[in-house]
Each structure stands twice: as structure tokens, then as C-alpha cells.
Amino acid sequence: MNKIRTRYAPSPTGFLHIGGARTALFCYLFAKHFNGDFIFRLEDTDVKRNVEGGEASQLENLAWLGIIPDESPLKPNLKYGKYRQSEKLDRYKEVLDMLLEKNLAYKAYDLPEELEAQKLESEQKGFASFRYDPSWLKISDEEKAKRDLNNQFSYRIRMPKDKVFSWNDLVRGEISFSSNEISDWVIFKSDNYPTYNFAVVVDDHDMQISHVLRGEEHIGNTPKQLALYDYLNWSSPQYGHLTIITDMGGKKLSKRDLSLKQFIEDYKNEGYIPHAIFNFLALLGWTSEDAKEVMSKKELISKFNPARLSKSPSKFDVNKMSWFSKIYMKNQSNEEVQSHLDFKDFNSNSSWKEIFTSTFKESATTYLELQKALNNYLNPMSSELVLNEEELKVVKEFKANLKSFTVEEIQAAINLTASNLKLKGKALFMPIRKACTYLEHGPELAKAIYLFGEKLITERLAKYEN
């Protein structure tokens, strides 16, 4: 069997989107499961939409997730040519010339306004969808020569008639299209750049891509690409078209929807655990046979079976992603967690750091959340919290019961306060937490108090002396 080779081929038009990250991840898992190669290449021929730094952003965010390509523009294998489309224009022109020589493609002189007029006529005749008619435009050879000089032309493929293009989709099973449903389409634009459907075929062939996993919006592109493979007498890869990702209401994710953070960069900046997102994305349209959810990268690679890719849309549940991050945070070593935190010039002994980390990582979702908790100890805030009469009674009792300043003695004082005042739950803990930490929520109370240090807690409790 030939080596499995998959690819993720984004355009450098912005940050790595959740949808793109999932596609890259599935391609990566597929390749690694079969001991193959995962390739990153760049579709950068749409110059107007390219964003400076877009390529670096894509690669950096993939690396942060743990998706490392075997080949990329930064790690090329010269055997497979260039990894940026903008560097392959001569190669595309070479393939275009092959098609022109065989009369499988032709030059089309339609101006944009002429195409619009043809579409309008098609609508008026009652056709459901527009199909380009190469015989519609009637212009003289003189006009053609003029348009040649002004680069007012494109190249179109001559689609075959009465041919069925079909493939066994890795996700959806058998899919077929009649060539009669597809009009001659543009393969080279007037700016001398190839179109997506043309360039992607050349790239996949040159890089010997064996399997393509991509979004379902590309289903309609596949028969066009298969036509090119036929004309060029090349073997096509196997295709699989992933279902859409929706929000929790079932609406397809849109980059224009600013109410939902949809870019990996957002979650990276918030301090999510990278592998938590890796794990979460792997289950966004795929399940393991044993229905296990929390899995290492090694497990996911081992268990990845493309036959278990979902045929139904997947919901992007931020709460579920946070759940994964919380689990991975909890299971990380204190040393690993501390490496992501800025203790500034804090010179306390290592046991303080250990207690802080052990206490707060139990309930934290992100490193940013942990850093905010740490900052509260490094730069203690003043309080505007007001205690009522019942709460004051609890705090005074706690203060009277606190004999020495250790975690164990603080807990003993809390327990004795509960016993003496016959209190439990919020009525017991909230007044003590507010008086000592100036917060209404937090982790295990005795440790949260201890971490502020005896001097500061003594000062805070002194406010509540008789």
C-alpha cells in the first residue's frame, strides 16, 4: 500500500478558526494512525484576501495545539515541489498548457457584465441554476485581439457530456454527480492566477496526497476536480467531507458572529490547556468505539477510525471544552502549572507555591484564571464588602477560635465556629471568606486564608474586634 499522505491547506486570510483546526486535526490523526505524513501547504493565490502574518499565525496555533506537520513551507520536501501556491505559478501554467494542447480547455472572453447578462437570460428562461454557455458570446476576432491585449479573458475547462462522476466518500458513502449539471468552469483567471479547483488538483497530485478530509461545502467541487484528474490521467485521492459545526442553537458557525469566540488564538490567550482543545476537537464529529472522552494524543491516534466520523452536524459547546480544560488542569503536575504563571518577584518558600497550585488548580479552567487568583495574593485588594450582624457574629467567633496560623488550625477554627454557632454551609463559610479573603467565592477556605499570610489576615480580622 502506498504511504498515507493527508494535507491541511488554508489560505493566509486570518487566524486559525475552530473549523479549520478540526479539519487539520482529523487530517493529522488520520495520517498518524496509518503511520503516514501530514502536510501543511498554503493556498495564497487570492492576493487581495491574504493577511500579513497569516501563514505564521496558522502554523503557530497548530503547533500550540500539538499538530505538527511533517512537511510545510518551513520544512519542505523538494521531491513534492513548493508548499505555497504563489511559488508554483509556472507549474500551474504548464498544466494549463497541457489542457489547451488537448483542446480540453479554452480561452473565454466574457466580461463581467456579459456574464451577468447571460445569467439574467438564464433566469428569465426559468432555469433553476446558471450554466455557462460558451456559444453565447458573439464577438469579432478584432474584439478578441483587443481583449487579449488588455488581459480581458480567462481559461475554462471543457466539461465532458453525459459522464457520471462518483466517489465513495469516507464520511457519507457513495456520492454521484452528472457532468451535465456542471458547466465549463474557470481554471485560470485574467490575473494569471489559477482558481482553487484547478490549483488544488495540481497540488494534491504533485504532493501525492492519498486522502483528503475537508468540509462539506467542498462536495460540489469534487466532481469538477475529478474531471481534471480524468483529463490529466492522474489518480485522484480518496475524499471525505466533514459535517458542519454549529452553535448550541443549531446554527452554522459564522466568522461574522462575534458573540462566540471561534478562533484558537482566543482560547490560547485565555490560557486554555492546549491538549484539552485537541481532545475536545477530536470529539467534534468523531467518537471512539469505547465512547471514552478523555484521551491522550497517543490514544487518539491509536483509536482514530475514519469510519466513525459523524454524518450529523456537531455542536460547538464551549462549556464542554472548558470541562476538558478543567480536567487537564487538575491532572497536570504543579511544576507544569507553575511554569505558565508569573510569580513576579515573589520570594516566598516553595511550599507556599505548592499549596497555592494544589489548591487552585483543582477548580481552575485556564491559566489566566489561575494568574488572576495568584495576583490577588501578590497584590491584595482592599474591600468594600459589608457584613451584616449575623455575619459579624460568625467572624468574631472564628477570630476567637483561631489559636495559631496553620492550615490545620484554620480548619479547626472553622469547625469549632460551626459547632458553637450550630451553623453549616453558606451561613458559616461566606462571612469568614468575605472577612478574610475579600471575595465571595474561592477554593478550599482554610487554604485560601492561609495563603494570604498571618500578618495580613490578623490585620483584616482586627477590624472585627469588640
From Swiss-Prot:
Q: What is its main location?
A: cytoplasm
- One GO molecular function term? ATP binding
Reaction catalysed by this enzyme: tRNA(Glu) + L-glutamate + ATP = L-glutamyl-tRNA(Glu) + AMP + diphosphate
Q: Report the SS bond pairs.
A: none
UniProt enzyme class: ligase
Q: Where is this motif: 'HIGH' region?
A: 10-20
Q: Which UniProt keywords apply?
A: Aminoacyl-tRNA synthetase, ATP-binding, Cytoplasm, Ligase, Nucleotide-binding, Protein biosynthesis
- UniProt xrefs under CDD domains: GluRS_core
State the oligomer form and interacting partners: Monomer.
- Function, please? Catalyzes the attachment of glutamate to tRNA(Glu) in a two-step reaction: glutamate is first activated by ATP to form Glu-AMP and then transferred to the acceptor end of tRNA(Glu).
Question: What name does the UniProt record give this protein?
Answer: Glutamate--tRNA ligase
Q: What is the lineage of its organism?
A: Bacteria, Bacillati, Mycoplasmatota, Mycoplasmoidales, Metamycoplasmataceae
**Quick one: which gene encodes this?**
gltX
